[in-house]
Amino acid sequence: MFSLALRARATGLAAQWGRHARNLHKTAVHNGAGGALFVHRDTPENNPDTPFDFTPENYKRIEAIVKNYPEGHQAAAVLPVLDLAQRQNGWLPISAMNKVAEVLQVPPMRVYEVATFYTMYNRKPVGKYHIQVCTTTPCMLRDSDSILETLQRKLGIKVGETTPDKLFTLIEVECLGACVNAPMVQINDNYYEDLTPKDIEEIIDELKAGKVPKPGPRSGRFCCEPAGGLTSLTEPPKGPGFGVQAGL
């Protein structure tokens, strides 16, 4: 039988992992991924008649994208063209997916499959600044909870909500691949890393002022270097021919 200490530890771990499982569900729900949410339901803001068309500039970009693939394989361009639609519109209504299918001459279902699989495609409107807080294990161990709590208090919204002025949307996401710089958040295309609650408040203040905060670590270190500085690769690499026998 488990000792009382082991039982308590197991209970604590179960609660912790249960919370993060719920967070994953929240992320999936917000992005329109998972389970029954693969089924589209028309709403006043998201239906086949929702106005959407690419700009002339983006039609030219699509032509350039399609040329990267062999003739007859334009379906390979679904991901980048969906991304282009989202960058133009801010999110992907079903009408945008239909337009992508029309432009690439593929069945609409092929586009729906992609748009519902990747959570990076936003199937509901988001704010001008889409704040994605990583709460996976490495960030959690580096106190990402305090970052999330600070954002909720600062913005006056909960996870999955958008501020009334449509400026900020806040969601939780799974690993963003910057574990060595935990805790971190992604805001639109930029990573902000090595965060403290004070850092994230300053970032929000800059965004509210119309500025673009400098992305990357806030701790002063370069990229993902060790906090104490480099311990290897401390000098420029040797030139061509280094270590090669003179007769070769």
Swiss-Prot record:
[2Fe-2S] cluster binds at residues 134, 139, 175, 179. Signal peptide: none annotated. It catalyses: a ubiquinone + NADH + 5 H(+)(in) = a ubiquinol + NAD(+) + 4 H(+)(out). Residues 1-31 form a transit peptide. It is a peripheral membrane protein. Its EC number is 7.1.1.2. The modification Phosphotyrosine is found at residue 192. The modification N6-acetyllysine is found at residue 60. It comes from the Eukaryota. Belongs to the complex I 24 kDa subunit family. PANTHER family: NADH DEHYDROGENASE [UBIQUINONE] FLAVOPROTEIN 2, MITOCHONDRIAL, NADH DEHYDROGENASE UBIQUINONE FLAVOPROTEIN 2, MITOCHONDRIAL. Core subunit of the mitochondrial membrane respiratory chain NADH dehydrogenase (Complex I) which catalyzes electron transfer from NADH through the respiratory chain, using ubiquinone as an electron acceptor. Parts of the peripheral arm of the enzyme, where the electrons from NADH are accepted by flavin mononucleotide (FMN) and then passed along a chain of iron-sulfur clusters by electron tunnelling to the final acceptor ubiquinone. Contains one iron-sulfur cluster. NCBIfam families: nuoE_fam, PRK07539.1-2, PRK07539.1-5. This is NADH dehydrogenase [ubiquinone] flavoprotein 2, mitochondrial. It comes from Mus musculus (Mouse).
